[in-house]
């Protein structure tokens, strides 16, 4: 396989820019180390529970948003209906 010669844009400079943003620090509740008393299975169970809690919270938030959106649509519909009745009287 032949490699093509590098042009000036592809030559690495001394000030390199990372391709990905720096990783945020791992939250303490998601950290696992073999030296801890917690077994790997217990860690996975705990992480699964946390993910379930987050999924339920997102689902609940989505349902509340949907109910609020339905109420807004119903109120606007009623308001426009009342305005139409008032204008056509």
Curated annotation (Swiss-Prot):
Compartments it resides in: Virion membrane; Host Golgi apparatus membrane; Host smooth endoplasmic reticulum membrane; Host cell membrane
UniProt modified residues of type Phosphoserine: 33, 35
Region Acidic, annotated ranges: 29-38
GO-annotated cellular components: host cell; host cell Golgi membrane; host cell plasma membrane; host cell smooth endoplasmic reticulum membrane; membrane; viral envelope; virion membrane
Region named Disordered: 1-21
Membrane-crossing residue ranges in chain numbering: 67-87
Virion surface topological segments: 88-89
Membrane-protein topology: Single-pass type II membrane protein
InterPro entries in the record: Herpes_US9
Modifications made to the protein after synthesis: Phosphorylated on serines within the acidic cluster, possibly by host CK2. Phosphorylation determines whether endocytosed viral US9 traffics to the trans-Golgi network or recycles to the cell membrane.
Side Intravirion, residues: 1-66
GO BP of this protein: intracellular transport of virus
Motif Internalization motif per record, residues: 20-23
Bias kind Basic and acidic residues: ranges: 1-10
Keyword terms: Host cell membrane, Host endoplasmic reticulum, Host Golgi apparatus, Host membrane, Membrane, Phosphoprotein, Signal-anchor, Transmembrane, Transmembrane helix, Viral envelope protein, Virion
Family: Belongs to the alphaherpesvirinae envelope protein US9 family.
Function of the protein: Essential for the anterograde spread of the infection throughout the host nervous system. Together with the gE/gI heterodimer, US9 is involved in the sorting and transport of viral structural components toward axon tips.
Protein name: Envelope protein US9
Lineage start: Viruses, Duplodnaviria, Heunggongvirae, Peploviricota, Herviviricetes
């Amino acid at each position: 396989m032949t490699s093509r010669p590098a042009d000036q844009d592809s030559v690495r400079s001394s000030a390199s820019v990372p391709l990905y943003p720096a990783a945020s620090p791992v939250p303490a509740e998601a950290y696992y180390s073999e030296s801890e008393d917690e077994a790997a299975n217990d860690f996975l169970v705990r992480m699964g529970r946390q993910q379930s809690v987050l999924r339920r919270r997102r689902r609940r938030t989505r349902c509340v948003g949907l109910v609020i959106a339905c109420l807004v649509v119903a109120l606007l519909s009623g308001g426009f209906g009342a305005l139409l009745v008032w204008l056509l009287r």
